[in-house]
């Protein structure tokens, strides 16, 4: 593993243990050249996924990009980081288990929205505002009104 501080390719693993999400290995590394210490994570990847964008463009699935968009939606919400990590790992496992390596971005967005809706409504609305490309306050109002249970009809 290359040292992120000095570029040395000869680093040493000082400690390995399961990460908090229990689906990856956390490794503490040391660079003998500069004395730098850093952490890496190792995860199992069942298959190489390709995202099919709405434009038809294809790009490799990037777990980091998925994680970043979810963390932005969850920003300043009272959700434990471990729960977010578990949710992300669950989404990736679900994508890998779909049986196809080519996955439309729409499918990924829908799976993320399902997961967010179960955990935090505010994060769900935040993510939806970007995913569904809200342009005005009316878009938010319509979306949120669909979330609210309808009042029982008077007889």
From Swiss-Prot:
Function according to Swiss-Prot or TrEMBL: Negatively regulates transcription of bacterial ribonucleotide reductase nrd genes and operons by binding to NrdR-boxes.
Keyword flag Repressor: yes
Organism: Cereibacter sphaeroides (strain ATCC 17023 / DSM 158 / JCM 6121 / CCUG 31486 / LMG 2827 / NBRC 12203 / NCIMB 8253 / ATH 2.4.1.)
Cofactor(s) it depends on: Zn(2+)
PANTHER family the record matches: TRANSCRIPTIONAL REPRESSOR NRDR (PTHR30455:SF2)
GO MF terms held by the record: ATP binding; DNA binding; zinc ion binding
UniProt entry keywords in alphabetical sequence: ATP-binding, DNA-binding, Metal-binding, Nucleotide-binding, Repressor, Transcription, Transcription regulation, Zinc, Zinc-finger
Protein name per Swiss-Prot or TrEMBL: Transcriptional repressor NrdR
A GO biological-process term: negative regulation of DNA-templated transcription
Pfam families according to UniProt: ATP-cone, Zn_ribbon_NrdR
Cofactor: binding comment: Binds 1 zinc ion.
């Amino acid at each position: 593993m290359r040292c992120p501080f000095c570029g040395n390719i000869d680093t040493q693993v000082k400690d390995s243990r399961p990460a908090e999400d229990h689906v990856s290995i956390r490794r503490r590394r040391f660079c003998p050249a500069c004395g730098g210490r850093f952490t890496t994570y190792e995860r199992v990847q069942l298959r190489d996924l390709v995202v099919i964008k709405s434009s038809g463009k294809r790009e490799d699935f990037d777990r980091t990009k998925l994680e970043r968009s979810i963390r932005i939606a969850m920003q300043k919400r009272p959700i434990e980081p471990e729960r977010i990590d578990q949710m992300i790992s669950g989404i990736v496992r679900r994508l890998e288990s779909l049986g196809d390596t080519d996955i439309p971005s729409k499918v990924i967005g829908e799976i993320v929205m399902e997961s967010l809706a179960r955990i935090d409504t505010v994060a769900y609305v935040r993510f939806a505002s970007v995913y569904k490309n809200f342009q005005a306050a009316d878009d938010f109002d319509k979306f949120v009104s669909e979330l609210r249970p309808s009042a029982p009809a008077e007889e």
